Amino acid sequence: MKTIFALVFCCAIAVVVLGFGENEGSTIDHDQNNCKGPGSRCSNKNECCKPKDMETYTYYCGSRWDSSSGDFVRKCVICNRESSMC
């Protein structure tokens, strides 16, 4: 019982210290426009924040696997142009 209590207590402390995750709200990109950060759900590219270095990085709204819903969802992505994963 003490072990379970200690585990729950440590998890609670971790949540307080680290905070909760982003709620997919909008952020402000370097051009002072409201946009959605990487990993946020989107319906088109225009909703996503642009990378600061557009020569090295690109961005798009693409399908990604969402383990919580068990399905593919469209999310904002920023990746290196030279990467094979982009």
From Swiss-Prot:
A GO cellular component entry from the record: extracellular region
UniProt subcellular location: Secreted
Superkingdom to which the source organism belongs: Eukaryota
Molecular function (Gene Ontology), one example: ion channel regulator activity
One Pfam family hit: Cys_Knot_tox
Tissue: Expressed by the venom gland.
Signal sequence annotation: 1-19
Keywords, sorted A to Z: Disulfide bond, Ion channel impairing toxin, Knottin, Neurotoxin, Secreted, Signal, Toxin
Disulphide bond pairs: 35-49, 42-61, 48-76, 79-86
InterPro entries attached to this UniProt entry: Cys_Knot_tox (IPR035311)
Transmembrane segments: none
Function: Probable neurotoxin with ion channel impairing activity.
Family the UniProt entry places it in: Belongs to the neurotoxin 21 family.
Comment on protein domains: The presence of a 'disulfide through disulfide knot' structurally defines this protein as a knottin.
Protein name per the record: Toxin ICK-18
Naturally occurring in which organism (per UniProt): Trittame loki (Brush-footed trapdoor spider)
